[in-house]
């Protein structure tokens, strides 16, 4: 039982990380006013970090689903 609580916790943490990455990409692409005083370099770095975080979250969720389907 505890094993599945750990998996449930990992799933929820990763889902939250995915939502954070999606929100960041949304702010960067659809709400330029939210960017503020960031330089172009900061903008690109933030976008790159967000897309990598999104890909990592998707990979983790896929792995959890493969080995511990709901």
Where are these regions (language model features)?
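Extended, charge-rich alpha-helical interface modules
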Residues: 2-70
């Amino acid at each position: 039982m505890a094993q599945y609580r750990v998996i449930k916790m990992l799933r929820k943490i990763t889902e939250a990380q995915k939502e954070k990455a999606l929100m960041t990409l949304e702010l960067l692409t659809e709400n330029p006013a939210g960017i503020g005083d960031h330089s172009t370099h900061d903008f690109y770095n933030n976008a790159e970090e967000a897309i990598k975080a999104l890909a990592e979250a998707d990979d983790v969720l896929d792995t959890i689903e493969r080995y511990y389907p709901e």
